[in-house]
């Protein structure tokens, strides 16, 4: 199929699986990966990055920023698993083991007591209408509870917003025009 696409669309299709070895090693896509230390080689972790595959997409930039600022971080990500303990979307939609992964992330954060936690996810995927009051918690409720818990422990919280969301699959939409 890619050989039948115009050059500009073929380039787009090739980047779909364009993950670096470190992104693959440090992103818990398979349920087997371990958290990765990023940045400077120091004794204590100063920040934790926690999120879904959108966090994983930021890995290289955060790794470089941590090195540049001489700080050490821990990277925890799992695809299709928002960093929202207690949240279950209506009708499921999580990868197997997401609640356990989030519990592990919270235990790790509580043990390390970093100065900051950076939460990164494809937030739109977990908002209404996917999040219903009949779920264990709505995404908003889970986010507020998490931020409160972390701040009560003296941890600063940063939430990275997602890139602008398109209601259409851009590559598919381009593809239908050829």
Label every model-predicted segment.
Residues 1-178:
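Extracellular/periplasmic envelope-modification machinery, especially enzymes
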